[in-house]
């Protein structure tokens, strides 16, 4: 069984037991969180597609950790002006483990 749900403006395809990195959520480590914006739920035989959401669809997950991703380097450069600027960015994330999918 798998589901597609929406969180942080992105869609994620998950199954029970999967670990997913989402945009940062203000939830403490070890707590349970429910995602109700479920777009699709499928088991071996049937597929429930929402219009736009599946009625009664819910994905339950446990928060494992919070952290920051790999550094992305940004370089701005102006030719012939002796001007260059180098910056970096590390995006915060929340890592969750999917515990249940309800249709």
From Swiss-Prot:
The record's section on InterPro entries has: bL21-like, bL21-like_sf, Ribosomal_bL21, Ribosomal_bL21_CS
Its GO CC terms are: cytoplasm; ribonucleoprotein complex; ribosome
Offer an example of a GO molecular function term for this protein.
rRNA binding
Is Ion transport a UniProt keyword of this protein? no
Q: Which UniProt keywords apply?
A: Ribonucleoprotein, Ribosomal protein, RNA-binding, rRNA-binding
* GO biological process, any: translation
Q: Does the keyword Flavoprotein apply?
A: no
What is the protein's known function? This protein binds to 23S rRNA in the presence of protein L20.
- Family as reported in the entry's similarity comment: Belongs to the bacterial ribosomal protein bL21 family.
| PANTHER family reported in the protein's UniProt record | 50S RIBOSOMAL PROTEIN L21, LARGE RIBOSOMAL SUBUNIT PROTEIN BL21M
**Assembly and binders:** Part of the 50S ribosomal subunit. Contacts protein L20.
- Name of the protein described by the UniProt record: Large ribosomal subunit protein bL21
Organism of this sequence: Shewanella loihica (strain ATCC BAA-1088 / PV-4)
Q: What is the lineage of its organism?
A: Bacteria, Pseudomonadati, Pseudomonadota, Gammaproteobacteria, Alteromonadales
